[in-house]
Amino acid sequence: MRMSKLYKNKEKENEKPSNEPPIKQDSLKRMSSKFLGNSLNSFDLSGKLEQVDEYLKKYPFIIEFGYKLGIKPSYIVVFGGSALFISLVLGWGAALICNLVGFAYPAYQSFKAVESQGHAETKLWLTYWVVFSLFFFIEYLIDIILFWIPFYYVIKLLFLLYLYMPQVRGAETVYNYIIRPILLKHEKTIDDTVHKISQTATNHLNQFTGNIAEKLVQEGVRRRNV
């Protein structure tokens, strides 16, 4: 009996209301809406789009294209970027997009650098092609593994842009800190190997062409005698 009374008294003590006032649902809603409003105000979407429109004035063809469609140029960039991202994620023409970014644009810029005879720009694009060639070779060797990496084409596109974007010039960083030290260390070995291979190939080619020429001469002599 005493134990049951003690147990009941403890239950009553636990059931006593606490002195702390409960948080009302209305106050929670106001707090959440205030937080959301502050977040949206801190990220001024219209202001960001206006900045994009201002930047796109450097590219008249985008301005003209937007004027024909009846929309702001920033919308074209947003829609185009979204479509590009979806294509890369789903693999729709992802290889073509990466080839355009990795081959076509750098090739045209290399042409402009050569024609302008600008030493700095020519060096930049030569550096890019050295890094890109190594990247292409490694990609070819481990293509089966790369197939299973999620969002690989997105990563590849960002890496290619990183290599030649003027704001970062990533190709120079990769070349100076990774490729250049390795090539300088093994330059003599590489040169000797290339020289031996080219000399061997030249000897085999000369021997092959010599055998063909000899057979042609013998065939000509045989036909004359007939």
Swiss-Prot record:
Residues 1-25 are annotated as: Disordered. It comes from Plasmodium berghei (strain Anka). GO terms for biological process: endoplasmic reticulum tubular network membrane organization; vacuole organization. It comes from the Eukaryota. Changing L45D: Does not affect membrane tubule formation. Disruption phenotype: During the asexual blood stage, parasites have a slower growth, a delayed ring-to-trophozoite transition and display abnormal endoplasmic reticulum architecture and an enlarged digestive vacuole. In infected mice, the number of male and female gametes is reduced, resulting in a severe decrease in the number of midgut oocytes and salivary gland sporozoites in the mosquito. Sporozoites have a slight reduction in motility and the invasion of host hepatocytes is slightly delayed. In C57BL/6 mice, parasitemia is reduced and the parasite fails to induce experimental cerebral malaria (ECM). The keyword ATP-binding does not apply. Required to generate and maintain the structure of the tubular endoplasmic reticulum network and the digestive (food) vacuole. Induces high curvature in membranes and causes membrane tubule formation. Disulfide bonds: none annotated. It is a multi-pass membrane protein. The keyword GTP-binding does not apply. The N-terminus is important for protein stability. May form oligomers. Residues 93-94, 141-143 are lumenal. This is Protein YOP1 homolog. Residues 1-72, 114-123, 163-226 are cytoplasmic. The chain crosses the membrane at residues 73-92, 95-113, 124-140, 144-162. Changing L49D: Does not affect membrane tubule formation. Residues 8-18 have a biased composition (Basic and acidic residues). Belongs to the DP1 family. It is found in: Endoplasmic reticulum membrane.
